[in-house]
Design a protein with these regions (language model features):
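N-terminal leader segment of winged-helix/HTH proteins
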Residues: 1-34
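N-terminal positioning helix adjacent to the helix-turn-helix/winged-helix DNA-binding module
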Residues: 8, 12, 38-40, 101
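N-terminal helix-turn-helix DNA-binding core of bacterial DNA-binding proteins
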Residues: 25-68
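C-terminal regulatory/oligomerization modules of transcriptional regulators
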Residues: 1-5, 127-145
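Charged, amphipathic alpha-helical coiled-coil/dimerization segments
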Residues: 24, 74-134
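DNA-binding alpha-helical recognition surfaces that contact promoter or target DNA
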Residues: 71
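Single conserved hydrophobic/aromatic residue that forms the stacking wall/gate
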Residues: 146-151
Length: 151
């Protein structure tokens, strides 16, 4: 292990990033032909299958910037996986709804994601998972304070 690798291994942010990249790559390899990326899977699963989901609620649920989400939604629309529906009572509200094909892919994405989740939980002890959840929750709380000056 070289000096950079030794230093990087001890940096929390790098470990989180590296783990996420490996999970992302693994999931994408498993689903790229059917679904596309993990981001696509998460968007499809965020959308209520019966009523759709208000477009303004999707980005915060996913932790995405609105601009990134807009590009992703446009791509999903072009692939005919989702469509936009305006609220009949309040025209300012726009809902993203799943097409029939979008619903099929949502179900595939959910199965694959829960399969990945199960494989992780099968290999990691409950104690270690609890510690992981505690640490990640604490990290999130550190950076969700109201003022950037608090960091």
């Amino acid at each position: 292990m070289n000096k950079y690798e030794k230093i990087a291994k001890g940096i929390v942010v790098n470990r989180i990033r590296s783990s996420w990249i490996e999970i992302f790559k693994f999931y994408n390899e498993q689903t790229s032909k059917e679904i596309g990326t993990l981001s696509t899977a998460f968007v499809l699963m965020t959308i209520n299958e019966k009523f759709g989901t208000q477009v303004t609620k999707i980005a915060p649920r996913m932790g995405m910037e609105p601009n990134s989400l807009s590009r992703l939604l446009k791509s999903l629309e072009e692939k005919e996986l989702v469509f936009k529906r305006k609220d009949t009572k309040d025209k300012r509200k726009v809902y993203i709804c799943l097409t029939e094909n979008g619903l099929k892919l949502r179900n595939i994405a959910a199965k694959r994601l829960f399969s990945l989740e199960k494989s992780i939980k099968d290999k990691i002890s409950t104690t270690d998972l609890s510690a992981f959840y505690k640490v990640t929750d604490t990290i999130c709380l550190l950076y969700t304070s109201p003022s950037p000056r608090d960091h």
